[in-house]
């Protein structure tokens, strides 16, 4: 079976080669004058020569068991490409030739077939070697193409990376320049700050030294001031003791002398300086003359008199105000007395009517007047009054009218006492205001006398005069240090019956 297959394959190869030879020699499909069914000789030498030249276009043999698939696919593709090149007319002529040559090939001998088989095997081996070489070349070319592609891709990537690298290098250079500039600025600022810090440290040390020196000087000065204050306090105490030992006139003279000695012409007022400067006749040494001094002293006296006149006007106004206050108080008191008198008359009428009605009622019930077992209205009022001799004079003062009159007198006395208290408080307030203004003026003129606001406590005792009214004969008002207003009823209208005890303000009321 293998021999038959080999012979059939060899015959197919021979037929294919004859067809190719016909194509090369110029046969256009007419069979070169041959008829179908005829027997013709085949030249194997010429065919073998063409095979050796490498121009065999025979179709590929059947694949053996040991052949590779890539070789078969390569041969098949080559054969298919060659077959596609022939025209359709040549294919029909080839089929006719094959049918005519089958009979002629069957008559060949076995030896010739073996020789042909050996030759074909050799050619197949040569073709295998050539195929392997061409495959190696193809593989090498593919690898070279891959390498070239990778190199092209790498070239593109490297160009991009080179551009990016150049940009990064430029950025790095610019950043390095900026960093160098910033470092230089930092070093410059650091040096400048060091210099400033050193200068401030020197200033701080110098100020600390000066502060220490000033503290020491301040301590010394404070000690000196304390010593001077203590000496001044002692001298002021001695001065006050000496003034207390003198009379009022001597005290005034001493105060005037002290003011003149302290002030002199160095502490003269603006008016005195103006008068002294207006003088044209200058004495020896540029001092003002006696006439200028006299004019300055007269100006000063004139100002003092003006101040005293203002004080007198104020006191006059106060006197008018006090007189008006007394007048208003007495008018109010008279109005109250009139109202109380009207009320008393009405009460008397009502009391008389009530007594008559009660007596008539008792007479109607019992036929005789009832004894007075209870206290009367006047006795009850007297019992409410806390007096020592009220129990002794209970029988004499049994009528309620007398008791009411006594109560009215007491109320009037209280009202008068309150009015006097108001006046005295007003007077004391004005006196204190005057003293405050005088002390402020003295402080402005003589600032050394700050510790002595009351140098002359007996100066304004004459301002408080004895006050009198038609009812009260003695009203005593003391000085501003302690004032007690006492009111005694030594002279009272004889028409009114009063108690024997004295009605006065309590001793606890002190202004």
Swiss-Prot record:
Basic and acidic residues bias (residue ranges): 43-54
Residues the record lists as Phosphoserine modifications: 504
GO BP annotations, alphabetical order: activation of GTPase activity; negative regulation of cell motility; negative regulation of Rho protein signal transduction
Localization per Swiss-Prot or TrEMBL: Cytoplasm
Main location: cytoplasm
Record bears the keyword Coiled coil: yes
Keywords: Coiled coil, Cytoplasm, Phosphoprotein
Biased composition (Polar residues): 1-12, 83-108
InterPro entries: CCDC125
Protein name, entry field: Coiled-coil domain-containing protein 125
Cytoplasm keyword on record: yes
Superkingdom assignment: Eukaryota
Record region (Disordered): 1-110
Sections of the chain in a coiled coil: 105-243, 293-325
Function: May be involved in the regulation of cell migration.
Molecular functions per Gene Ontology: identical protein binding
Gene name of this polypeptide: CCDC125
GO CC terms: cytoplasm
